[in-house]
Amino acid sequence: MVKKRKNNGRNKKGRGHVKPIRCSNCSRCTPKDKAIKRFTIRNMVESAAIRDISDASVFAEYTVPKMYLKLQYCVSCAIHGKIVRVRSREGRRNRAPPPRVRYNKDGKKVTPTQGAKTA
């Protein structure tokens, strides 16, 4: 039988069993090593209200607290939510992370190689 992935879609080497976690989106039980994990940092207040809060605040330099979330998705929710994409057979062999899209102050896309040239 043909193997689709070298690691069988999980990060379990030499362990017999891994404790399941619950998907952040649908609460499905998924092995911890198979789940797609993303760590996000967000402001607790939306960006439109930050200026209003800072104007109304008594303190001069008040920083709005941030939310630190570890999101863990099952494979189907990660694909549906476009956190990961289905890749071709050759694409599955590529272990490098996808290139990150960066924006400059004007809101235009900048590739890391362009940023190094201009600096």
From Swiss-Prot:
GO terms for molecular function: mRNA binding; structural constituent of ribosome. Pfam families: Ribosomal_S26e (PF01283). Keywords: Cytoplasm, Ribonucleoprotein, Ribosomal protein. Residues 1-20, 88-119 are annotated as: Disordered. InterPro entries: Ribosomal_eS26, Ribosomal_eS26_CS, Ribosomal_eS26_sf. GO terms for biological process: translation. One of its GO terms (cellular component) is cytosolic small ribosomal subunit. It is found in: Cytoplasm. Belongs to the eukaryotic ribosomal protein eS26 family. Component of the ribosome, a large ribonucleoprotein complex responsible for the synthesis of proteins in the cell. The small ribosomal subunit (SSU) binds messenger RNAs (mRNAs) and translates the encoded message by selecting cognate aminoacyl-transfer RNA (tRNA) molecules. The large subunit (LSU) contains the ribosomal catalytic site termed the peptidyl transferase center (PTC), which catalyzes the formation of peptide bonds, thereby polymerizing the amino acids delivered by tRNAs into a polypeptide chain. Component of the small ribosomal subunit (SSU). Mature N.crassa ribosomes consist of a small (40S) and a large (60S) subunit. The 40S small subunit contains 1 molecule of ribosomal RNA (18S rRNA) and at least 32 different proteins. The large 60S subunit contains 3 rRNA molecules (26S, 5.8S and 5S rRNA) and at least 42 different proteins. This is Small ribosomal subunit protein eS26. It comes from Neurospora crassa (strain ATCC 24698 / 74-OR23-1A / CBS 708.71 / DSM 1257 / FGSC 987). The gene is rps-26.
